[in-house]
């Protein structure tokens, strides 16, 4: 479950609230899409069901998910089984795997699930994706909202630098 959840957020930028509310009916396996209404904006969004994300979901559903009757994909693994909520356990999940990977963060309260959205946006900038594509991936209607997520890399800043004429 953890792997599938982390991968979906890292690769697709889905907000944790939308991830917790993801239902089987949101997955269009035939067209390889994930379609849902965002909780924060109430806008419909359609994201590609990337192969690695799809396989992680299949593995979780077939091998890790408790066999319970609920439309929600992600559920708790301790009785009483229910849909996963938006509590702070997600930040603990990220920190747990950071510790296992011997990764450290200067600011531990900024290494939760939401930081994976920031990382995705930064990676898309580094890959020179169009700003409009980044906004669409993050589910933003306004590019102003997307600007908050972008941390421009040093190499990209060097590309913008002007030559200094000799004096």
Predicted regions and their residues:
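Conserved catalytic core of the tyrosine transesterase superfamily
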Residues: 1-167
